[in-house]
UniProtKB/Swiss-Prot annotation:
The keyword Repeat applies. SUPFAM superfamilies: Annexin. It comes from Rattus norvegicus. One of its GO terms (molecular function) is cholesterol binding. Its main location: cytoplasm. One of its GO terms (cellular component) is melanosome. Seems to bind one calcium ion with high affinity. This is Annexin A6. It holds the Pfam family Annexin.
């Protein structure tokens, strides 16, 4: 069993088996594998119920009793994923890691994700044991093999981590914290090009406690989390490795919770990753991983494994997991405090928003107007030229092109485009040609037209736009449709949902900072309306109105403080509780507001992902997000997308769309991450 620090609580899910008898277990395993077929149920039940130390004793007893190698017999009797899981459990952790790394660097291609996961997350002691195990098992030097299979700064950082010389957590120097912040800042943000050596030295050698202080101070000094600077300054596998190191320094269990979620979400399961983590963390921090998983993803690790795997493989994984946290229906106080700390950090964070479309240099509206006219004249249409010009100009420049087109040719550019292109490409190009407020106004109008209302589009636009954007939309709606937006919303929606939309459509959200006393009162209102407060006060209708007022009119910085106070007061995350306690369009509207306040680029990254996953593509949502965010924060959205879904929007668009529509979307996307 893993060594526990003195006074520390054991957080593994697998314990030493009481009344353990190695000979008896060896006999039971021999019996389970004897004859025709094997008793897989008995094998998994026994092996998942013993600690790693006890399993090593069973291996020894098996050899003494039968003169045979237990692992070799298990490999012979079992197959597939179940065999890989059971065999991994039978190896000492260091040898298990050594085998994973050997597999990662053998053959054609390298499994960089496996190398990153193991070397970024292990302690000094675990690294030393791994190096020794690799030498013992393969009679080769691990460092030499890593050097032979990797290159560049990625290789250098792996070699640094392989030394296992990170300072102990009691090594913290306040003066050095400031110096490291300055060195990292100068090596990245302030330098033309990046001094990767500074990042490697500081992140590869300083103690975890010291680096946590460095990260906090870096955020205060630069207004950016260290992760944002790493994404901006580094690239490729080196960037992924450094981000993994930062995540493990902040919270190793959270890093593994994310890895497990990504291993099981979407089509297909990454079984090697799932097995590696469940085996390696079962006697270290599985309970912490479960807590964070439950809070972060609103489902238990147990339930996700249950739904994503099958057979004996599933049963063995569930035994290692050790319990279903959904059964209790509660969020863990420890995990809630992680969320609280996240809000504490976000309070001082100033993330720079960046679009992917910028004003073109050497802009010539005359040449662009002529280029577009030529592309649409005669037989056939030159879609490539249309896409190239329109996606590479800012919206202000496009309006100048429209005016120049009319002055030169006496023709309406929008009308010509409508007659020459069609379908999804037409919707995208025409959307780009409209001023943003008029585009949003049109999207709102279309959402309320005909039979049925597109509530999701109404929510997406009204919950995410700034006051200035909302006011411009109101003016554009009145100008284009000769009716106020409020009247349109009133006639097309009803009840509490209507009141929320009208409140958002006034564009009267406060724009100041936070008020701590008011935030505590607002958090209490939220706790009462969501029925988790100890002492509810006031009638429900009044509370509903106050809750709506809080979410629809308070400033973003203030709401972040409210959400933080809500966690402190209840040990719940407000978004999770809204999803659990509310329903329908009201729930969707409030969740959208909360998500937008928490992280607007992530909100839109989720929208993009959902528009392209599964059968069929939601082209309307995909187009709306790409058009409306291209000059605001699409670069930030790209980063959130790849962070959460492990693939880039560029890859998703390539895989889910085609033809000229795809080309135009990729041009707006602005690059492959």
């Amino acid at each position: 069993m893993a060594k526990i620090a003195q006074g520390a609580m054991y957080r593994g899910s697998v314990h030493d088996f009481a009344d353990f008898d190695a000979n008896q277990d060896a006999e039971a395993l021999y019996t389970a594998m004897k004859g025709f077929g094997s008793d897989k149920e008995s094998i998994l039940e026994l092996i998942t119920s013993r600690s790693n130390k006890q399993r090593q004793e069973i291996c020894q007893s098996y050899k003494s009793l039968y003169g045979k190698d237990l692992i070799a017999d298990l490999k012979y009797e079992l197959t597939g994923k179940f065999e890989r899981l059971i065999v991994n459990l039978m190896r000492p952790l260091a040898y298990c890691d050594a085998k994973e790394i050997k597999d990662a660097i053998s053959g054609i291609g390298t499994d960089e994700k496996c190398l990153i996961e193991i070397l970024a997350s292990r302690t000094n002691e675990q690294i030393h044991q791994l190096v020794a195990a690799y030498k013992d098992a393969y009679e080769r030097d691990l460092e030499s093999d890593i050097i032979g299979d990797t290159s560049g700064h990625f290789q250098k950082m792996l070699v640094v981590l392989l030394q296992g010389t990170r300072e102990n957590d009691d090594v913290v120097s306040e003066d050095l914290v400031q110096q490291d912040v300055q060195d990292l800042y100068e090596a990245g943000e302030l330098k033309w090009g990046t001094d990767e050596a500074q990042f490697i030295y500081i992140l590869g050698n300083r103690s975890k406690q010291h680096l946590r202080l460095v990260f906090d101070e870096y955020l205060k000094t630069t207004g950016k989390p260290i992760e944002a600077s790493i994404r901006g300054e580094l690239s490729g596998d080196f960037e992924k490795l450094m981000l993994a190191v930062v995540k493990c320094i902040r919270s190793t269990p959270e890093y593994f919770a994310e890895r497990l979620f990504k291993a099981m979400k979407g089509l297909g399961t990454r079984d090697n990753t799932l097995i590696r983590i469940m085996v390696s963390r079962s006697e270290l921090d599985m309970l912490d991983i479960r807590e964070i998983f439950r809070t972060k993803y609103e489902k238990s690790l147990y339930s996700m494994i249950k739904n994503d795997t099958s057979g004996e493989y599933k049963k063995a994984l569930l035994k290692l997991c050790g319990g279903d946290d959904d059964a209790a229906g509660q969020f863990f106080p420890e995990a809630a405090q992680v969320a609280y700390q996240m809000w504490e950090l976000s309070a001082v964070s100033r993330v720079e928003l960046k679009g992917t479309v910028r004003a073109a240099n050497d802009f010539n509206p005359d040449a662009d107007a002529k280029g577009l006219r030529k592309a649409m004249k005669g037989i056939g249409t030159d879609e490539a030229t249309i896409i190239d010009i329109i996606t590479q100009r800012s919206n202000v420049q496009r309006q100048q092109i429209r005016q120049t087109f009319k002055s030169h040719f006496g023709r309406d550019l929008m009308a010509d485009l409508k007659s020459e292109i069609s379908g999804d490409l037409a919707r995208l190009i025409l959307g780009l040609m409209m001023p943003p407020a008029h585009y949003d106004a049109k999207q709102l109008k279309k959402a309320m037209e005909g039979a049925g209302t597109d509530e999701k589009a109404l929510i997406e636009i009204l919950a995410t736009r700034t006051n200035a954007e909302i006011r411009a939309i109101n003016e554009a709606y009145k100008e284009d449709y000769h009716k106020s937006l409020e009247d349109a919303l009133s006639s097309d929606t009803s009840g509490h949902f209507k009141r929320i939309l009208i409140s958002l459509a006034t564009g009267n959200r406060e724009e100041g900072g936070e008020n701590r006393d008011q935030a505590q009162e607002d958090a209490q209102v939220a706790a009462e309306i969501l029925e988790i407060a100890d002492t509810p006060s006031g009638d429900k209708t009044s509370l509903e109105t106050r809750f709506m007022t809080v979410l629809c009119t308070r400033s973003y910085p203030h709401l972040r403080r409210v959400f933080q106070e809500f966690i402190k007061k209840t040990n719940y995350d407000i978004e999770h509780v809204i999803k659990k306690e509310m329903s329908g369009d009201v729930k969707d509207a409030f969740v959208a507001i909360v998500q937008s306040v928490k992280n607007k680029p992530l909100f839109f990254a989720d929208k993009l992902y959902k528009s392209m996953k599964g059968a069929g593509t939601d082209e309307k949502t995909l187009t709306r997000v790409m058009v409306s965010r291209s000059e605001i924060d699409l670069l930030n959205i790209r980063r959130e997308f790849i962070e959460k879904y492990d693939k880039s929007p560029h890859q998703a668009i390539e895989g889910d769309t085609s033809g000229d529509f795809m080309k135009a979307l990729l041009a707006l996307c602005g690059g492959e991450d």
